[in-house]
């Protein structure tokens, strides 16, 4: 019987397999940041263990760093301590670090791909949920906890139970104005936040093939929001063109050999998935979340649902709680929901193509009175590339704030937060209660919808401008 893409990559990395035990996987790339690594490094130090493969370990500062006044000391003592610990640990154990203000610094899931470190057929881990981003390259990439971070630092291996496999096939072409972010929000709304639990999702079909690499990263990034262990897309010419010439990509005969192998990394025709879902791309429109989990999403042109629309008592209760927290009334058109803040950035949508999409909408327009718009590039390289194209001038002319690189308002662990009761349209990945600050209300959207929303002050698709 044939094998799926996930099974091929998994099998190629099994160091030890024994009945009744998890497989021991070799890890090709370990990405590290300041939040989940301090205890792991301290455990190595206390045990007197060296770092097994510093050459396969890369660190960057992203979660806690400010995106303004970056030359000043970090004001929050906990954030400052975590950043300082990362710098100390990387220096002691020989890990390459991209610190704040370094031209290579940025969000870990933006930095890895732009360096060409994320490659097809690899196993990639990080102490961060959205490590699934790298699955866009045909890598098996997933988040791990701090104790697992220690295990990888010490051994370059990780015990893991073999996951199930799931295929999400998106047939046809995405309509004009529908983006990768809309696609993944629609998928999560369809299968639910637990729909991928215990599975590696492989995204397939013409619509997925038509996405750029940055669009594919957006889709794979939010696999965890569907409950999946990881998300993957089989590599193809789009993948190879993106990687060619990057700092850590092979060259010459080594490149040719790598591409020849990468072309074998597709699910076999007779491979059997544990679950399959098919979606018609033509049916999709711009999506937005209305509730407090990414599965509570709907087309922007629809109405906010009512608890009575749900037969399951648990679902009804969840909707009631979400509407109360979000301060919304069932039956209200989503397009009438007003916002205070717009955030464009994150490891989901902080890449150059995302900023271009937002700038295309904002060019020649102004951010609405009373609305604050933050544009935060995913890395210092993205920032430099955007400035070379004049995108920063477009944002500033529109009245938006142009920031330095970092996770920023994706999560309330740095100065960029919502105040209680404030509502945002955000290109990030999670809309949980308090995710962007205590009492903050988050609507997940694409960069284009975020930019259009900034102009009108209410949830808006660009086509409505």
UniProtKB/Swiss-Prot annotation:
Source organism: Frankia alni (strain DSM 45986 / CECT 9034 / ACN14a)
One Pfam family here: Aconitase
Superkingdom, natural source: Bacteria
Record-annotated membrane-spanning stretches: none
E.C. no: 4.2.1.33
Binding-site positions, [4Fe-4S] cluster: 347, 407, 410
Presence of the UniProt keyword Nucleotide-binding in the record: no
Gene: leuC
Subunit structure and binding partners: Heterodimer of LeuC and LeuD.
Pathway: Amino-acid biosynthesis; L-leucine biosynthesis; L-leucine from 3-methyl-2-oxobutanoate: step 2/4
Keyword Iron-sulfur listed: yes
UniProt cross-references to InterPro entries, sorted A to Z: 3-IsopropMal_deHydase_lsu, Acnase/IPM_dHydase_lsu_aba_1/3, Acoase/IPM_deHydtase_lsu_aba, Aconitase_4Fe-4S_BS, Aconitase_4Fe-4S_dom, IPM_dehydratase_rel_enz, IPMI_cat
Co-factor requirement: [4Fe-4S] cluster
Function (record text): Catalyzes the isomerization between 2-isopropylmalate and 3-isopropylmalate, via the formation of 2-isopropylmaleate.
Bound cofactor: record note: Binds 1 [4Fe-4S] cluster per subunit.
Stored HAMAP family: LeuC_type1 (MF_01026)
CDD domains per UniProt: IPMI (cd01583)
Protein name per the record: 3-isopropylmalate dehydratase large subunit
